[in-house]
């Protein structure tokens, strides 16, 4: 099987990001974004997706966490895109219902080569600690655009904002973990009748 580990840097005037992603890992992680809550979400994502992720981000957190969160999503999406290449042999689709106490989230993914984000998630508070809840959507929009991929989040239940967002990131880990798996019976095929995924 081809090596699906990618290292990349993404530097702007707002953030400097260095990351290594291994799609065929075991769920190990070392994450430092300067935002404790975002670190926690990325660690959950890596653990439940069985991705190995080493990521550091130095961002303009003195402003807020918006640029850091969005740019980490963009960079992580770019890493997925490079690691997947022409998508040959992957399952392509993945979905997962994730219960987190009273919260229940569905995440469904299609590595279609087309960007769509459906964010049907409703939180009752604007912040978790010092993290702006609206930044979570920006993270997933950045990732979906960069892969590019179709990503749906649908909330069926939930009151606690931390639980809701945790279910989103864990569920996405499971869904993406399933989508990137190699289908051994069709490992030389691109999973599309078009012959390519764009």
Language model: regions and residue ranges:
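N-terminal intrinsically disordered, cationic/polar leader segments
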Residues: 1-198
């Amino acid at each position: 099987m081809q090596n699906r580990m990618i290292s990349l840097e993404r530097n702007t005037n707002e953030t400097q990001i260095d990351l290594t992603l291994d799609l065929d890992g075991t769920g190990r992680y070392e994450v430092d974004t300067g935002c404790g809550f975002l670190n926690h979400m990325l660690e959950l994502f890596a653990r439940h997706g069985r991705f190995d992720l080493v990521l550091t981000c130095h961002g303009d957190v003195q402003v807020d966490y918006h640029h850091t969160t969005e740019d980490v999503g963009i960079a992580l999406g770019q890493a997925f895109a490079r690691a997947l290449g022409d998508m040959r042999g992957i399952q392509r689709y993945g979905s997962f219902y994730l219960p987190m106490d009273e919260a229940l989230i569905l995440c469904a993914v299609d590595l279609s080569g087309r960007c769509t984000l459906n964010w049907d998630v409703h939180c009752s508070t604007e912040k978790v600690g010092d993290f702006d809840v609206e930044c979570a959507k920006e993270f997933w929009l950045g990732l979906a655009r960069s892969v590019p991929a179709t990503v749906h989040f649908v909330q069926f239940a939930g009151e606690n904002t931390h639980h809701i967002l945790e279910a989103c990131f864990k569920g996405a880990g499971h869904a993406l973990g399933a989508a990137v798996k190699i289908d051994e019976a069709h490992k030389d095929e691109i999973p599309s009748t078009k012959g390519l995924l764009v």
